[in-house]
């Protein structure tokens, strides 16, 4: 899609409108769909157009890549499409963090942007984010060290501005109070690290006075220590890798996460395995039980519900391309539950009195913002206020009853058969 700006077209329905590109007939032309059939020649012949393309943020789901270099040497003949590949493309995702009043946003394996809500006299909602100068062009994610105001790029480029040098175990941190300067000098605090336990940094979470960085196999703690080293970094766990970028959450002094190696973990000064009574149900696909989809682990989202002292992990079951299951841990009662609930993201109560979440549905055209020629293939996201009422109420006030049920598994009775309740 693109937004036309600075146009001289006279057709009012063409000016400053977002369009979906329908086809690309050549390297210099593309096709869009107008809201109504043209009755004159204005939109065809008048003026010039400066298109402003949206940023490509990646695939909708984890996708195998079958292009040049897929497979082993000599696997097939020249020019023959490959039917197998070891190259996997991650789904598009974002890491978001505050740098003071500004928002820092990094596309997963992409660029970093900054949104400045107060920029001159322009209203915040009409102000667009812009690419943050001086930053790497390909990083797994970014995170801000609040205590000392460094912007940290994880899984980033060894040569800034050269995407082919991305090293998914390489870490850069900016100069203090300057998120655009990464070159270390004798008078600034910018610097780099490379960690070595694992093959890629998957995600990171802020703790009380540290950052917990999780690879696909291990856990590291990164802490601000001041000059001359700025940061220290040490490995605190192994065989505890993170499943997906958003599969970890900080709660009351500890970080909880779901591992791609099986099981749940917590870091509260040391890495510990979290006992889980439903681990087999969540991880194992056997018979009619469909465990987690390992192919879509990047979609897992961990959310904290402080109203009920719960941590929720939303995940896609085996055979599903999108999130449709939930596993919940009550960290006060130390009780696990599972369920069917599709939530793509989840935000705990903070500024607002209720938790809020989103749900993505495939093959439904979005309704906001208005995009001319939009197709259902783009999918639709709903925004939910959680933990209010007992039914689902849409934006128009239409109420739908939520079907609820309880399902349990086998469990042992007390030897006397007493004290059991359902």
Q: How would you label these PLM feature ranges?
A:
Residues 104-105, 211, 255, 355:
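Hydrophobic beta-strand segments that make up the repeating blades of beta-propeller
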Residues 9-12, 94-95, 209-210, 318-319:
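Short consensus segments that form the blades of beta-propeller domains
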Residues 33-41, 108, 116-118, 315-317, ...:
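Secondary-structure transition/turn motif
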């Amino acid at each position: 899609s693109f937004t036309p700006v600075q146009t001289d077209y006279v057709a009012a329905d063409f000016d400053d409108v977002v369009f979906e590109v329908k086809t690309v007939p050549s390297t210099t032309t593309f096709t869009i769909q107008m809201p109504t059939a043209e009755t004159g020649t204005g939109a065809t012949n008048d003026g010039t157009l400066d298109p402003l393309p949206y940023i490509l943020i990646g695939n909708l789901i984890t996708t195998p890549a079958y292009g040049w270099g897929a497979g082993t040497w000599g696997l097939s003949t020249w020019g023959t499409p490959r039917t197998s590949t070891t190259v996997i493309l991650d789904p598009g995702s974002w890491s978001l963090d505050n740098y003071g009043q500004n928002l820092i946003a990094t596309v997963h394996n992409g660029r970093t942007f900054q949104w400045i809500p107060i920029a001159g006299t322009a209203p915040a909602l009409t102000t667009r984010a812009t690419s943050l100068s001086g930053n790497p062009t390909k990083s797994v994610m970014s995170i801000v060290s609040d205590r000392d105001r460094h912007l940290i790029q994880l899984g980033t480029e060894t040569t800034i501005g050269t995407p082919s040098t991305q090293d998914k175990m390489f870490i850069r941190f900016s100069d203090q109070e300057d998120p655009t300067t990464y070159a270390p000098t004798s008078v600034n605090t910018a610097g780099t690290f490379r960690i070595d336990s694992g093959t890629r940094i998957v995600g990171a979470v802020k703790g009380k006075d540290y950052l917990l960085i999780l690879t696909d196999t291990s856990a590291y703690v990164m802490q601000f220590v001041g000059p001359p080293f700025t940061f220290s970094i040490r490995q605190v766990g192994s065989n505890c890798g993170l499943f997906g970028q958003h599969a970890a959450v900080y709660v009351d002094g500890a970080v909880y996460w779901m591992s791609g190696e099986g099981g749940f973990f917590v870091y509260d000064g040391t890495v510990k395995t979290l006992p889980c009574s439903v681990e087999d149900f969540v991880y194992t696909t056997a018979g009619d039980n469909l465990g987690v989809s390992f192919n879509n682990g990047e979609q897992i989202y961990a959310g904290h519900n402080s109203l009920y002292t719960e941590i929720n992990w939303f995940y896609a079951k085996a055979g599903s391309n999108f999130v449709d299951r939930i596993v919940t841990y009550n960290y006060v009662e130390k009780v696990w539950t599972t369920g069917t609930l599709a939530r793509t993201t989840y935000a705990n109560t903070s500024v607002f009195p209720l938790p809020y979440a989103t749900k993505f549905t495939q093959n439904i055209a979005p309704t906001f913002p208005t995009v001319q020629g939009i197709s259902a293939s783009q999918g639709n996201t709903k925004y939910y206020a959680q933990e209010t009422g007992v039914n689902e109420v849409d934006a128009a006030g239409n109420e739908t009853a939520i079907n609820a049920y309880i399902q349990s598994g086998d469990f042992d009775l007390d030897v006397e058969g007493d004290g059991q309740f359902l």
